[in-house]
Regions:
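Conserved structural elements of the adenylate-forming
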Residues: 6, 11-13, 43-64, 126-130
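Short beta-strand->loop structural element characteristic of the AMP-binding/adenylate-forming
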Residues: 1, 8, 42-44, 71, ...
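Conserved S/T- and glycine-rich ATP-binding loop of Class I adenylate-forming
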Residues: 27, 33-36, 69, 75, ...
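Conserved AMP-binding A3 loop
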Residues: 28-52, 180-183
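Structural detector for helix-capping/boundary residues
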Residues: 25, 47-48, 73, 114
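Conserved pre-ATP/AMP-binding loop-to-beta segment of ANL
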Residues: 2-32, 39, 62-68
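Conserved AMP-binding/adenylation subdomain of ANL enzymes
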Residues: 51-68, 78-117, 132
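Gly/Ser/Thr-rich phosphate-binding loop
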Residues: 116-121, 130-187
């Protein structure tokens, strides 16, 4: 209890004082990206941008109460920020977090321990998982979505063969909050 009182007042105020509701058009985040141009820029995303993107993804995949998302994508990237931070929070989907997406040994252990059902990552991360995660650790995973870079056919084939789940590809950019389109299962 003493540690609670040691917190700075601005943290206590933020945690316990009600804030005025935010308008959907207000800025929710500024995500920095160099995108395809190579020129760094800050992309302003509104609450409406994020909400629409999250609702669209949730509508496509229709998450179930027993689903668990592995959140290993960095929050400074729009893919991680939207689908591994905010999507679970908004949809009520459970999430398991790990700070290093290339720590495949720990990722595999977390997937098995928490029976993760949804894995989101880049093709680079999926390639690392192919090398270092055992098939038994991935038994609970029923949905894999890759984004942020091109998903090569050989990675899809190797992942499907080793783990018995076919990665789906998403496309987007930071300016789109970030998901523009995604493959859907069973099509």
């Amino acid at each position: 209890m003493a540690a609670f009182y040691a917190l700075p007042s601005f943290i206590l105020e933020r945690a316990f004082l009600r804030k005025a509701p935010r308008a959907l058009g207000e800025t929710a985040a500024v995500i920095f990206t160099s995108g395809s141009t190579g020129e760094p820029k800050g992309v302003v995303l509104s609450h409406a941008n994020l909400r629409a993107n999250i609702e669209a993804v949730a509508q496509v995949y229709q998450f179930k109460a027993e689903d668990r998302i592995l959140g290993a994508l960095p929050f400074f990237h729009s893919f991680g920020y939207t689908v591994t931070l905010w999507l679970p929070a908004v949809t009520g989907t459970a999430a398991v977090y790990h700070a290093n997406p290339l720590d495949a040994k720990t990722i595999g252990s977390l997937i098995a321990k928490h029976r993760v059902t949804i894995l989101l990552g880049t093709p680079t991360f999926l390639t690392a998982y192919l090398r270092r995660i055992e098939p038994g650790q991935m038994r609970s995973v029923s949905l894999v979505i890759a984004g942020a870079e091109k998903l090569r056919a050989e990675v899809v084939a190797a992942f499907a063969e080793k783990f018995r789940v076919t990665p789906l590809e998403g496309f987007g950019c930071t300016e789109l909050s970030p998901v523009a389109c995604v493959n859907i299962p069973d099509v």
